[in-house]
Every structure is written in C-alpha cells, then in structure tokens.
C-alpha cells in the first residue's frame, strides 16, 4: 500500500513540476514582417504570457512603444518587460496579456505619417502590423481588449494613435510623453537637436494632424472619453511642463483621465517603475467593471 501511495505522490509531483516548467512566459525580440506601405522589412518584438502555450484561449493585447533612439528591444533589454509583466500577472495585479513592441527606429520622427516624404509609418502600424500580429497570435478582437502605451517619443505616439483611432483602443497610457510645442518655429528648433530636418510646411502639417493639443480641439468629447487615459511623468523630467500642459488641456476639455507625477526623471529607472502601474491600469479595462 505504501509503495502505491508513494508512486501516486511521485506521479502527481511530476505532473505539477512539468506544468510549472512549461508554463513560462516567452519573449521574441527579433521578429520580422514585410511592409508594402514602407517598402521595407520591419521588426517587432512580442511578449507571450506564462500560460499562452498551455492554453487555447485568446488574450488582450498591449501595444508598447519605445522612445527615440531605441528599437523593439528597448522595453525588453532596459525596461525588463518580461520580469515586470511576469510578476504583475503572478501577483494578480495584471491579467495575462500579449505585449507587442514595434520597431520605429527609422531615422525619422518614428510613429507619424509624413506624406511629403512618402513616409507612412502610422498607416503601416494600423493597416499592416496590427492585422498581422492579431492574426498570428491568439489575440481577442475588439476595442475593449486592446490598449496602447509608450515612453517619450512612444508616449507621443500613444497619444496620437489613440486620438486618431479611439474606436480601436480601450486604454492609453503615455509615459513622459514627447508632445513638444504647438508652435512651428519652436518645434523646428527643437527637432534640429536630434539631427532631423523638416521644412516649415512639413512641421505645420505634422503639428496640425498629430499634436494632441490640436487633436482634442477637433474631436467629440464622447470619442475621447471612450478611452481610459493614464498620463505619467516624473517631476524632474525635462518634459514635465509639456505633460502638465497636456493634463491641464485634458481637464479643461472635460476629458476623464488619471494624471500621475512621481519622483523621477526621463530615464529607464522611472519607466520600469511605471510599467507595473500601466499593466494594472489597462487590465482593469480588459476586465468587466
């Protein structure tokens, strides 16, 4: 009898151990797809939650955008997305989700369309990248199960994409968002520091079509408020003023949003601390209230 019991216990332990070993998250940081819109190959990275390979269910998705000078590996290498997402899911603060990190390291202002330069990155994102990853991976369809976040330049992209397509995102969480000025001359001077050249007309069109302060003036309040907003910037960040003005503009417009200012600057230490809060915030939208 003891031998039978011992054998049964060992069998159960083996099954449990196997499940623990197999139920691990995975990150793929060098995935590729061909873009007809951009006429080039583009890279992206994906985080798959721990139970992805042991289940058959579909998952919500977070699009996570990097900043200027980084690529699709930034959030993996410096942002420690795997470790942070694993811990948030394990602790029950975040629901299991797929995280998609595109590469916008293109030598241009990454996330925007620039028609005069025949550069249509935003079209690529919505018309090629999103349909590709959402068909390749088991991602739940619909606005309710889709969120977007990003840091610095990616924070600016987060704002613009969510405002351009409020029908697609349930939540948007810009971190230390690089919004810049709405003034054309000031914006031209600012962007020269990064070695990027624009004509005055190009900058004028870019600001009119993409700057969040300009976009919210044209939009219906109901469309903007169909998105849950989380704005976060450190008190020592050089973009603190821009983000504060964004918060004020949102408040004056009547846009419901969370605004967080914590101790910190424009660096990965701050964004690593922000990511668990973002995962928790978007997860609340993925669940039913």
What are these regions (language model features)?
Residues 1-26:
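Bacterial Sec-dependent N-terminal signal peptides
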Residues 24-289:
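Non-catalytic cap/lid and distal C-terminal segments of serine-dependent acyl enzymes
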């Amino acid at each position: 009898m003891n031998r039978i019991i011992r054998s049964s216990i060992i069998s159960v332990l083996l099954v449990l151990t196997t499940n623990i070993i197999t139920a691990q998250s995975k990150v793929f940081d060098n995935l590729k797809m061909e873009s007809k819109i951009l006429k080039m190959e583009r890279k992206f990275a994906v985080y798959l939650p721990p139970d992805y390979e042991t289940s058959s269910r579909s998952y919500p998705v977070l699009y996570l955008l990097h900043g200027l000078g980084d690529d699709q590996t930034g959030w993996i290498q410096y942002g420690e997305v795997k470790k942070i997402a694993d811990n948030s899911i394990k602790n029950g603060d975040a629901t299991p989700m797929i995280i998609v990190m595109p590469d916008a390291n293109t030598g241009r202002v990454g996330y925007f369309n620039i028609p005069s330069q025949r550069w249509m990155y935003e079209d690529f994102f919505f018309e090629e990248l999103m349909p590709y990853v959402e068909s390749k991976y088991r991602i739940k369809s619909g606005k309710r199960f889709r969120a977007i976040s990003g840091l610095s330049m990616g924070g600016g992209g987060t704002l613009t994409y969510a405002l351009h397509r409020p029908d697609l995102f349930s939540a948007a969480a810009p971190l230390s968002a690089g919004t810049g000025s709405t003034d054309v001359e000031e914006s031209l001077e600012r962007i020269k520091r990064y070695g990027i050249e624009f004509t005055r007309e190009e900058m004028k069109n870019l600001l009119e079509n993409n700057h969040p302060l300009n976009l919210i003036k044209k939009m219906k309040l109901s469309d903007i408020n169909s998105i849950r907003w989380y704005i976060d910037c450190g008190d020592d960040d050089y973009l603190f003023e821009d983000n504060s003005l964004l918060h004020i503009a949102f408040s004056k417009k009547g846009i419901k949003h969370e605004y967080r200012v914590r101790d910190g600057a424009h660096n990965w230490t701050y964004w690593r601390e922000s990511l668990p809060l973002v995962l928790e915030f978007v997860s609340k939208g993925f669940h039913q209230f």
